[in-house]
Amino acid sequence: MTYLSSNQLKQYEDKGFVSPINIFSKDKAKQIRDEIEMIEKEMPGELEKSGRYNAHLISPLLDEVTHNPKILDAVQSLIGENILVCGTTLFIKNPNEKGFVSYHQDAKYIGLDPLNWVTAWVAITDSNEHNGCMRMWTGSHKENLKQHDQNFNEGNLLTRGQTVKDVPREETTPLILTAGQMSLHHPTVVHGSDLN
């Protein structure tokens, strides 16, 4: 079982996220990427816009990822054993294409209450500062929900372009992950990612 260590639990409590957590081998991560690329090739447009939500419903392999015991055990460490997967989203950021995620809080637009849930993000390719990895505003989960503007900027992968303004980049932490690793974050931590 991949229950989180006491240090990881403290990181989540203090910072609003925990990362990295080893889930898959690089070979398994490549198999998942190959599956996504096969869907893109054989069903053009299927994973674009609203099609990128709940892709686990069209792919047995992606469904297997969604119900992976290592992921569920880590989530259970934070929220307990009554786990409901309420959705999956693919954020596909191809090199040299416009694609970023504006700084936002998941709780602002997902609408689940109480805020005793967690977002799991699994990297299927290496994610680092050179290719626009996710950044967390460390400790921002301890504050109230922030005002979000809707900025429909070209390339923003969020449906409404929901954006928290004036995020101090020097207070953000890049989540450096290798393919097959995961991060977990609190629903009110402010996070986003740059262009690939």
Placement of each model-derived feature along the sequence:
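Double-stranded beta-helix
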Residues: 129-194
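Non-heme Fe(II)-dependent double-stranded beta-helix
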Residues: 1-112, 149
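Short, hydrophobic/aromatic alpha-helical segments in well-folded domains
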Residues: 61, 74, 106, 120-123, ...
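Short, conserved beta-strand element in jelly-roll/cupin
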Residues: 104, 111-129, 176-179, 184
